[in-house]
């Protein structure tokens, strides 16, 4: 259990509660969760964060009516800056998007601008939105994370409770290496409903070599851990920085979609450009 799982800031969320679906535009459906909930226990201060980054969302179930009442469909790409006061709670995002279904908009740009304005207001931070017609994306192959996969190690695991102990002395030697490690075994659980969240993670670093067995055991220990996607990525970044002390570090996770949305957070203390192609499970 996370230390803030029962925080009063979470009491008003629709997540985990029976909810009516609305199909006429309603910006009030959006709900934010303070980023400070998980940052404070990690001693991450808003004015001195050790990373930059964004939460990248893909919107697969986005539809509205044009001015003549003809349904329109699009795939949306949203980037929410890491400095925003709030992250966007995903069920509320889904309900909000559903409210577009029977609402008329004069243009695609009006939809994009509405999304951008509402998300900025909810997150209290910078948000960018792009909308794509389906024929712009058709035929795109599934992407893959560049790097060395650490999943096929011949080890025995019998403990799935989250622990940073696995990272103790995980970085050794004096030689500085620069490598990218990948795992598809990341699984955590929703902070509120405890439903499973499945993801792939890419860790790029420069520093003393990180023991791959210890890293894998650490990642697997998230299996019973309850936190939102964004919070897990910040925790992983913070733990690796604390225990392994790399000179450069980037952590990027791409999670499978739920409710027509996927969330793909990244955090970095160096130049990093995340590849945004969907992975095979997305």
Swiss-Prot record:
GO MF terms, alphabetically ordered: preQ1 synthase activity
UniProt keywords, alphabetically: Cytoplasm, NADP, Oxidoreductase, Queuosine biosynthesis
Entry's Gene Ontology BP terms: queuosine biosynthetic process; tRNA modification
Ligand binding (NADPH): 90-91, 258-259
Pathway where it operates: tRNA modification; tRNA-queuosine biosynthesis
Compartment annotation: Cytoplasm
Ligand binding (substrate): 88-90, 229-230
S-S bridge residues: none
Family named by the database record: Belongs to the GTP cyclohydrolase I family. QueF type 2 subfamily.
Subunit structure: Homodimer.
Name of the molecule in the record: NADPH-dependent 7-cyano-7-deazaguanine reductase
């Amino acid at each position: 259990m996370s230390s803030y799982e029962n925080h009063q800031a979470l009491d008003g969320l629709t997540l985990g509660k029976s909810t009516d679906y609305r199909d006429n535009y309603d910006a009030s459906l959006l709900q934010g969760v303070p980023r400070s909930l998980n940052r404070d226990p990690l001693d991450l201060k808003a004015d001195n964060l050790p990373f930059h980054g964004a939460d990248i969302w893909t919107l697969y179930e986005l539809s509205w009516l044009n001015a003549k009442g003809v349904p329109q469909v699009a795939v949306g790409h949203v980037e929410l800056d890491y400095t925003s006061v709030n992250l966007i709670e995903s069920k509320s995002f889904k309900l909000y998007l559903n409210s577009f279904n029977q609402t008329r908009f004069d243009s695609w740009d009006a939809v994009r601008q509405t999304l951008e304005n509402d998300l900025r207001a909810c997150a209290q931070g910078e948000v960018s939105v792009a909308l794509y017609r389906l024929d712009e994306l058709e035929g795109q192959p599934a992407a893959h994370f560049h790097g060395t996969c650490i999943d096929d190690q011949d080890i025995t695991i019998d403990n799935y409770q989250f622990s940073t102990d696995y990272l103790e002395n995980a970085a050794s030697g004096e030689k500085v290496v620069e490598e990218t490690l990948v795992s598809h075994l990341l699984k955590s659980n929703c902070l509120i409903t405890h439903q499973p969240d499945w993801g792939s993670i890419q860790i790029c670093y420069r520093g003393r070599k990180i023991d791959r067995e210890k890293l894998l055991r650490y990642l697997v220990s998230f299996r019973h851990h309850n936190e939102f996607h964004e919070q897990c990525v910040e925790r992983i970044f913070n733990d690796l920085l604390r225990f392994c002390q790399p000179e450069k570090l980037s952590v990027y996770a791409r999670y499978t979609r739920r409710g027509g949305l996927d969330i793909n957070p990244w955090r970095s203390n160096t130049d990093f450009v995340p590849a945004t192609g969907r992975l095979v499970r997305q």
